[in-house]
Design a protein with these regions (language model features):
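Short, low-complexity N-terminal intrinsically disordered segments enriched in polar/charged residues
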Residues: 1-33, 37, 41-45
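Short beta-strand edge/turn micro-motifs at domain boundaries
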Residues: 2-4, 97-99, 120-160
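Charge-dense, low-complexity intrinsically disordered segments
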Residues: 14, 18, 56, 114
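A solvent-exposed, acidic/Ser-Thr-rich amphipathic alpha-helical stretch
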Residues: 39-107
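Short, cysteine-centered beta-strand-loop-beta hairpins and adjacent loop/turn segments enriched
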Residues: 77, 105-116, 146-147
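Short, surface-exposed coil-to-beta transition loops
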Residues: 82-84, 118-123
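A hydrophobic membrane-anchoring alpha-helix module
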Residues: 144, 156-187
Length: 187
């Protein structure tokens, strides 16, 4: 038993780094989940009160950005799905820098035609841990490329599957134990 305690004591810094990386990635994932579900309060919950988001044409304090982006997602697109790639994270005490690759797809109507919008970019984030929770202090978005094209016919009967909801009525909220405005999974 003492060997285990000794091992934990010797590796406490490494274990804390793993925990920090996990919690930071969880914040990044909570943000895109909230955007895809159009949950304004859950998007806002990933930002500190004094945060700022530079998202190209939409740049605002984090809590204002949450409202602006959710309104845009609801009015312009019928669906939105973010896919996250690798994250590079450097933690220094209660501050961290993170770079995360994203691929986003959206569907919208244009003159009666369903259009597929695609973007690939990176989130360049500064996060801070306050009261034990990692949130964005500064979020900057790069855009590597974007594309828009008519969506072809589906090879699968989408209607035969569990239907998504762009709200907390989505099945993910129940299975993850989330409530409206809550983007973080309870630990």
């Amino acid at each position: 038993m003492n060997d285990k305690l000794e091992w934990f004591a010797q590796n406490a810094d490494k274990l804390q780094t793993l925990i920090d990386h996990f919690q930071i990635r969880e914040t990044i994932e909570a943000y895109v989940h909230a955007c895809d579900r159009c949950d304004r309060d859950a998007v806002a919950a990933t930002y500190h009160e004094d945060s700022f988001d530079y998202h190209g044409e939409i740049s605002n304090p984090g809590h204002v950005y949450a409202s602006v982006v959710v309104d845009a997602l609801k009015t312009k697109w019928e669906s939105c799905t973010h896919h996250l790639g690798q994250s590079r994270i450097k933690v220094t005490g209660d501050s961290a820098g993170a770079e995360t690759v994203f691929y986003a797809t959206q569907l919208r109507k244009e003159d009666g035609v369903t259009m597929l919008d695609q973007q690939v970019g990176r989130y360049i984030d500064t996060l801070e841990r306050r009261d034990g929770i990692w949130r964005f202090r500064l979020r900057r978005c790069t855009m590597e490329w974007g594309n828009s094209a008519p969506l072809g016919d589906s090879f699968v009967d989408v209607g035969a599957y569990l239907q998504p909801h762009r709200s907390p009525a989505d099945a993910s909220y129940e299975i993850l134990g989330l409530s409206e405005g809550s983007s973080f999974i309870e630990r």
